[in-house]
Amino acid sequence: MDWTSYHDYDEINAWLDSLATDYPELASVEDVGLSYEGRTMKLLKLGKGGADKPIIFIDGGIHAREWIAPSTVTYIVNEFVSNSATYDDILSNVNFYVMPTINPDGYAYTFTDDRLWRKTRSETGSVLGCKGADPNRNWSFHWDEVGASDSPCSDIYAGPEPFSEVEMRNVRDQILEYAANIKVYLTFHSYSQLWMYPWGFTSDLPDDWQDLDTLATNAVDALTAVHGTRYEIGSSTNTIYAAAGGSDDWAKGEGGVKYAYTIELRDTGNYGFLLPENQIIPTGEETFEGVKVVANFVKDTYS
C-alpha cells in the first residue's frame, strides 16, 4: 500500500493481513467482529515485547468522511514496521493495538455514494429513511447529555441507546479486554489541527488534566517541528464544543485509560474533509513524530 492516494476499506484490511504475513515476529491481526453491513473489523497488534507490555490503543475513521485519519494511522503503522530496527527500543517495550477504520460501512459509502457521509449506515426506523448514528456520540459515558441529537436524520444523532452501533461495541470490547495494559488511547479525526483530551461532556477538567496537557504539548512540539504545522491543545469542550458520548471520554471515564486523546488532523478548513492526496505523507510524517513522543513516554513510564 502507498500513501500517495486514499485507499478503500478492503484495501486497508488486505494490507493489515499482509503485515501479519510479512512480519510475523512483529505483527498479528485478529478479526474482532462484523459491521452492521457485514464487513470484517480487524485489530492489528504491533510489537515484539510480549503481551504484558503497556499498550497504546489507536483508532481512526470513526467519522466516515475523515479520510486522512485512516491514512495517517496506517502511515504510522508502516513507519514502525518498515523501520523496526530503528524503533526496536519502542517496539520491544510498547505494544500498539490498532484499528485504522472503525466505521467500515460509512467509510465504504463515502467511496461509492456520498463523499461527505459522517455516520454509520444502520437502519434507524426513520419514516424519512434516514440511516446511521454518529458513532462518536454513541458511547455510554454521559451519553446524549449535550452536543448530540435524538433525530435519526441528524449528523450528530446519538443513536437510540448507548452502544446501539455494533461497530462501537466491537471497539469497546477490545478496549475492555486489554484495559489493564492500555496506557494511552489515541483516536484520529479531521479536521482542525487539535490535540484534545477529555472532557467532552463538560467544561470541567479531569483532576489529572495537567498530566494530559503536558504529554500533549510535548507531542505537538515534535509534530510542529516537522513541517511547522500548528496545533491547538486543550480539553474537547474548551477547545471546540461540548459533545457527550465520545470515545475519548468513555476511554478515560469508563475504560480507565489515563491518557485519552482525540487528534484532529489537517487542515484548518481550507480543504476540510477533502484534504488533497499530496498532504497524506506530510500529515503522516508530522503525526508520527507526535506519536513517537507518546510511545517513548509510555516506554519510559510504564515498561
From Swiss-Prot:
EC number per UniProt: 3.4.17.2
Predominant subcellular localization, coarse grouping: secreted
A GO molecular-function descriptor: metallocarboxypeptidase activity
Pfam families linked: Peptidase_M14
Cross-referenced SUPFAM superfamilies: Zn-dependent exopeptidases
Coiled coil: none
Annotated positions binding substrate: 63-66, 118, 136-137, 190-191, 241
Keyword terms of this UniProt record: Carboxypeptidase, Hydrolase, Metal-binding, Metalloprotease, Protease, Secreted, Zinc
SMART domains: Zn_pept (SM00631)
GO biological process: proteolysis
Gene3D superfamilies found in the cross-reference section: Zn peptidases
Note on how the cofactor is bound: Binds 1 zinc ion per subunit.
InterPro entries documented for this protein: Peptidase_M14
One Gene Ontology CC term in the entry: extracellular space
Cofactor requirements of the protein: Zn(2+)
Catalyzed reactions: Preferential release of a C-terminal lysine or arginine amino acid
Active-site residues, record numbering mapped to chain: 264 (proton donor/acceptor)
Residue sites binding Zn(2+) per the record: 63, 66, 189
Family the entry assigns: Belongs to the peptidase M14 family.
Protein name, per record: Carboxypeptidase B
